Amino acid sequence: MDLETKVKKMGLGHEQGFGAPCLKCKEKCEGFELHFWRKICRNCKCGQEEHDVLLSSEEDRKVGKLFEDTKYTTLIAKLKSDGIPMYKRNVMILTNPVAAKKNVSINTVTYEWAPPVQNQALARQYMQMLPKDKQPVAGSEGAQYRKKQLAKQLPAHDQDPSKCHELSPREVKEMEQFVKKYKNEALGVGDVKLPHEMESQGPNKMHIPGGDRSTTAAVGAIASKSAEHKRTQYSCYCCKLSMKEGEPAVYAERAGYDKLWHPACFVCNTCRELLVDMIYFWKNGKLYCGRHYCDSEKPRCAGCDELIFSNEYTQAENQNWHLKHFCCFDCDNILAGEIYVMVNDKPVCKPCYVKNHAVICQGCHNAIDPEVQRVTYNNFSWHASTECFLCSCCSKCLIGQKFMPVEGMVFCSLECKKMMS
């Protein structure tokens, strides 16, 4: 498929999840409706991951595409109908007999994802070492957490040009090269094993302190100093605490098998969240999720959330923006050369600020212009003028004077306060 055809096929999937309720805003949101270029809901401004959108098949396609053309093709299967790679995530179902008065019932627990290991007891042990609210049990808070992290850590628009907005043919080509590079150099999937099993594979798999692993002395050290170094070689690369005997550890092949992590410590170096499904990116001795690895390589547009492959872009408020995306967060008007106000780290034009966000003056009851000086006390504000910041009793100007605040009113003296009480 040529680049021109790829550009024409691009779309953001606006029908996907349409009308889904927002888990954060509840009834305040009319239902999910994707903004035409931002990755948020037009109604409530929350992301798609905050809405109750059923995306399991779509997420499996996304992760499947991520693993395509990598050594992790065993984790994907291609659909016979269209050849699309699908992620074969390992689902684990545990059955526990529960004793009742008359008979024995079966309690079934389904994990929406589990480490792809043959030893189910090891996978179960791994799950139990995760925080309870992050265990992906179907229908639980942990399953919702996993779903949210899949969307946050592995954005489809970080790997698939067709999920981006109006890329040029040159940008498509550059993005494809970028994706190919990180698949070859950084992408990996964690491996769950018992540390002593790794040691039994030989000195080339485990780090033995006190000598070069290729020397005879180092090999001999395995037998003679195993007890002395046991705590050192089994310490977590993240928290530095010792691994308990018999507990599983997570290994990252790109980091080398001399490093291991507690299951709960296998986290992104930037956001500190669990690496979803143990999918990691390795760079300069650190683990990253997909999003924050890409952020370390390319600027990201604060407007559309996509990586910037254009040579020209805007930097403002310590953030990066496509030239066409430095817009008012409320009305989408371009802000180049215009006055704007930052509201929750989002730029808002002056008219929208006055209409939607400006504080109201307690004196004149009008919105306070963002360029006008004001006086603020607790949650109350006034224009810093002789017409507005006055004693609520005698109308004396209080600018530069001591005052007594009482429930949105201000007084110049105790006498005035008593007269109004």
Swiss-Prot record:
Ranges where the record places region Disordered: 134-164
Subunit structure: Interacts via LIM domain 1 with ZYX. Interacts (via LIM domain 3) with ENAH and VASP. Interacts with ALKBH4, talin, actin, alpha-actinin, GRIP1 and PXN. Interacts (via LIM domain 2) with ACTL7A (via N-terminus). Heterodimer with ACTL7A; the heterodimer interacts with ENAH to form a heterotrimer.
Main location: cytoplasm
Protein encoded by which gene: TES
Record-stated family: Belongs to the prickle / espinas / testin family.
Domain LIM zinc-binding, chain residue ranges per copy: 234-297, 299-359, 362-421
One Gene Ontology MF term: zinc ion binding
Disulfide bonds: none
A Pfam family per the record: PET
PANTHER family found in the cross-reference section: LIM DOMAIN-CONTAINING PROTEIN (PTHR24211), TESTIN (PTHR24211:SF1)
Compartmental location: Cytoplasm; Cell junction, Focal adhesion
Role according to the record: Scaffold protein that may play a role in cell adhesion, cell spreading and in the reorganization of the actin cytoskeleton. Plays a role in the regulation of cell proliferation. May act as a tumor suppressor.
InterPro entries tied to this protein: LIM1_Testin, LIM2_Testin, LIM3_Testin, PET_domain, PET_testin, Pk/Esn/Tes, Znf_LIM
GO biological process, one term: negative regulation of cell population proliferation
Name of protein: Testin
